[in-house]
Every structure is written in C-alpha cells, then in structure tokens.
Amino acid sequence: MSSLESARADLALLILYLNKAEARDKICRAIQYGSKFVSNGQPGPAQNVDKSTSLARKVFRLFKFVNDLHALISPPAKGTPLPLILLGKSKNALLSTFLFLDQIVWAGRTGIYKNKERAEFLSKIAFYCFLGSNTCTSIIEVAELQRLSKSMKKLEKELKHQELLKNEQYQMKLQKCNERRLALIKSSLDIVVAIGLLQLAPKKVTPRVTGAFGFASSLIACYQLLPAPAKSK
C-alpha cells in the first residue's frame, strides 16, 4: 500500500469516527473538562469555554435516554447472576433518568423552560443519578472481572502456556478482561467527577481536580469508541 493510499485509509477511518454523534460528544467533553481544569472555577476565557461547551454537548444527548430505557426493558444475558441483573437495571434506570433530566436543564439554560430554580434543582438530581449509575457500573465491572478471572484460571489449569497464546476462547476472555478494566477505571474517574460537580467534598475535589478526572475519563471514552482493528487473515 502506497503512502497516499495509507493516508486515504486513515482519513476514511477518521471520518467514520467523527460521523458518530457519541464520538463528537466525547471530544467536546474532553474540551469541556480540559477547560475546567485550566480555569479552576475562576472567571475568564477557559470558564467561558467550559460553560459554552457544556451547553453545546446537551444537544448531542437529546433523546439519548431512550437507549438506556430500551436496555432497561430488554431481557438480561443468560447466565447472569441476579444481583448483577439488578445492578445493571439500576444503572440503566439511573442513566436514563440523568439523560432525561439533562434535557430539561438544557431547556432551562437556553430560556425555553422559564423556571430557573426548578431547572437547577433538576440539574442536581441529574448529577446524583450520574453518580449512582457510575457506582453501579464500578460494582458490575469488579464482579464481572472476578467471574472472568475464575474462568481464565480454569483454562490456565487445563492448557499449557503456549496453548493459551493460541487458544481463541482464552484470548477473547483476555480482551474482555482488558475492556472491563478500562471501563472500571472510567467509571471510577466519573464518580469523582460527579462528586466534584455536586460539591460533596469541595476542599478535596476542587474544580481543577474535577476537570483533570473528567478530561481523563473523556479520553478513555474517545478510545473506547475507536473502530476495532481489522483481524489479520
């Protein structure tokens, strides 16, 4: 493949990536929290970028609550323990509520919804839902990692080291394990972000800390949305 063809292929992947509304939202989120880190809650250009980007992001999330509402009423995967099913449904319910309330907050900040006090109150409830959903996600990921670890250890006992490298089932479990570790890190970062936005620990979780954690979790989200690499034949 020539350098021109390689560049065209890379650009095609970039276009495919940027065509995703979710990807654009996460890029804007990285800009938002990066600006929050720079501003540290102080007035100035960085804080203006933080506020304007936050408002712009809400447009990307219009009717996004339907996704988690659908997941809430969908049957769980076979073999999933009941506690994990309940945690998963709680996560879906909380995230769906957060995204729904976020639309009212957007309407309040754009002047469509006139009751500003009610909009700010709903904004606080929305952030509590965001905190709850990420807490559920963290617990789920820890439990799923334990389940994966047990099944991987069982395979390790049955197969030799060289066979493990070639075993497709083991490699799939290893990939899932890495994905879940990354999801656990992201949800843990977002818990700190939610605590910062709710000002539950203002002395420890300052706007700069919130910005740093939010920026890191946004970069992880951007990475998670990258197209899967093509398998070599």
Swiss-Prot record:
* Membrane topology according to the record: Multi-pass membrane protein
Annotated function = Involved in peroxisomal proliferation.
Write down what this protein is called: Peroxisomal membrane protein 11-5
Task: List the keywords (alphabetical).
Answer: Membrane, Peroxisome, Peroxisome biogenesis, Transmembrane, Transmembrane helix
Q: List the stretches on the Lumenal face of the membrane.
A: 114-206
Q: What does the entry state regarding organ or tissue expression? A: Expressed in seedlings, roots, shoots, leaf sheaths, flag leaf, panicles, spikelets, and endosperm.
Could you cite one Gene Ontology molecular function of this protein?
identical protein binding
User: Cellular component GO terms, alphabetically?
Assistant: peroxisomal membrane
Q: What is the lineage of its organism?
A: Eukaryota, Viridiplantae, Streptophyta, Embryophyta, Tracheophyta
Q: List the ranges whose topology is Cytoplasmic.
A: 1-92
Native species: Oryza sativa subsp. japonica
Transmembrane domains' residue ranges: 93-113, 207-226
| Induction comment | By abscisic acid, H(2)O(2) and salt stress. Down-regulated by nitrogen or phosphorous deprivation.
